[in-house]
Swiss-Prot record:
SUPFAM superfamilies: Ribulose-phoshate binding barrel (SSF51366). InterPro entries: Aldolase_TIM, His_biosynth, HisF, IGPS_HisA/HisF, RibuloseP-bd_barrel. Its EC number is 4.3.2.10. This is Imidazole glycerol phosphate synthase subunit HisF. It is an enzyme of class 4 (lyase). It is found in: Cytoplasm.
Length: 258
């Protein structure tokens, strides 16, 4: 069994790390490279940078941030936001990113997933899916884009299967209902997607305590079956540390790097 991963997420807007609740009410959470170094030294397995303003406002992801991070940390990191071409993927990987995350651009042009995977290998291509539970009384979740502002009408599970077939090497799955609430991951969502695809699924949105993180990674009937847990508010606000979380997961018998 591959070791489970803890991945701090740094949502970036205008060069600063920000955090909100349900994708709104953003507040400043610090300098991205500074936080990246802190989490790297603390034992995080990977990092994710998401430029949450780029897709919405049409700006390119800051390559400078990638370069500075690559010079400062030794763990793998993913960058996403505003990547709309193979040239954009190339620029970020050359600047030092290990993976790129595609979200709105994958929905707008699914071929980009295949092109990126063919050029760089599927291990470099992450597809980020922002999911919101349907309020129509129908079971399931819809895919949202443009920073959670636009409902595509796509079914999350079917979309995850489609991008995996196109070449995505990993799914970054965010519950918009849970994002920033610290009320727990949407385990039903994570479990449904993990069961439907053959690539790792990263659980994101809602971690509030140690039990929530463990539940997302557990593989029993009530577990989330995720391969990794994305963490933001819990770490940025100092509620828990990477060391505390890893010690707890190891004590529960989960396979994770110490």
């Amino acid at each position: 069994m591959v070791a489970l991963r803890l991945i701090p997420c740094l949502d970036v807007a205008r060069g600063r790390v920000v955090k909100g609740i349900n994708f709104v009410g953003l507040r400043d959470a610090g300098d991205p490279v500074e936080l990246a170094c802190r989490y790297s030294h603390a034992g995080a397995d990977e990092l994710v940078f998401l430029d949450i303003a780029a897709s919405h406002e049409g700006r390119a992801t800051l390559v400078d941030l990638v370069r500075r991070t690559a010079e400062s940390v030794t763990i793998p990191f993913t960058v996403g936001g505003g990547i709309s071409s193979v040239e954009g993927i190339t620029e970020l990987l050359r600047a030092g990113a290990d993976k790129v995350s595609l979200n709105s651009s994958a929905v707008g042009r699914p071929e980009l997933v295949r092109e990126g995977a063919q050029r760089f290998g599927r291990q470099c291509i992450v597809v980020a899916i922002d999911a919101r539970r349907r309020n129509s009384g129908t079971d399931g979740w819809d895919v949202y884009v443009k920073g959670g502002r636009e409902n595509t009408g796509l079914d999350v599970v079917r979309w995850a299967q489609q991008v995996t077939e196109l070449g995505a090497g990993e799914i970054l799955l965010t519950s918009m209902d849970g994002d920033g609430t610290q009320a727990g991951y949407d385990l039903q969502l994570t479990r449904a997607v993990a069961a439907a695809v053959s690539v790792p699924v990263i659980a994101s949105g809602g971690a509030g305590c140690l039990d929530h993180i463990a539940a997302a990674l557990e593989t029993g009937p009530e577990g989330g079956h995720a391969s990794a847990a994305l963490l933001a508010s819990l770490l940025h606000d100092g509620v828990l540390t990477v060391e505390q979380i890893k010690a707890d997961l190891l004590a529960r018998g989960l396979k994770i790097r110490p």
